[in-house]
């Protein structure tokens, strides 16, 4: 009858065994490129400062708080749609580069 832990290596066997080979090259690139992070941080700052700033600028020029609120909401939407457009353009460029690479591999 076999022992309970017959499949497992003892500590001495594991220590005597050669270390697993390391890969020749490893991918150390970040999961998200730095320029994407910088764009996100820039648009985040714009989303915080823009609408609040527009609200107070509009109120300072004598408009009612309702008009200032609408102005702030419009500003937030403009910033949001601009971010979406920039992200779409970036994705479009990435797809074009991938298509060119695929085209070169096919030749």
Swiss-Prot record:
The gene is vma21. It is found in: Endoplasmic reticulum membrane; Endoplasmic reticulum-Golgi intermediate compartment membrane; Cytoplasmic vesicle, COPII-coated vesicle membrane. Keywords: Cytoplasmic vesicle, Endoplasmic reticulum, Membrane, Transmembrane, Transmembrane helix. Its main location: endoplasmic reticulum. Belongs to the VMA21 family. Residues 1-11 have a biased composition (Basic and acidic residues). InterPro entries: Vma21 (IPR019013). Required for the assembly of the V0 complex of the vacuolar ATPase (V-ATPase) in the endoplasmic reticulum. GO terms for biological process: vacuolar proton-transporting V-type ATPase complex assembly. The chain crosses the membrane at residues 41-61, 69-89. Residues 62-68 are lumenal. It is a multi-pass membrane protein. Residues 1-29 are annotated as: Disordered. This is Vacuolar ATPase assembly integral membrane protein vma21. A motif (Prevents secretion from ER) lies at residues 104-107. It comes from Aspergillus clavatus (strain ATCC 1007 / CBS 513.65 / DSM 816 / NCTC 3887 / NRRL 1 / QM 1276 / 107). GO terms for cellular component: endoplasmic reticulum membrane; endoplasmic reticulum-Golgi intermediate compartment membrane; ER to Golgi transport vesicle membrane. The lineage of its organism: Eukaryota, Fungi, Dikarya, Ascomycota, Pezizomycotina. Residues 1-40, 90-107 are cytoplasmic.
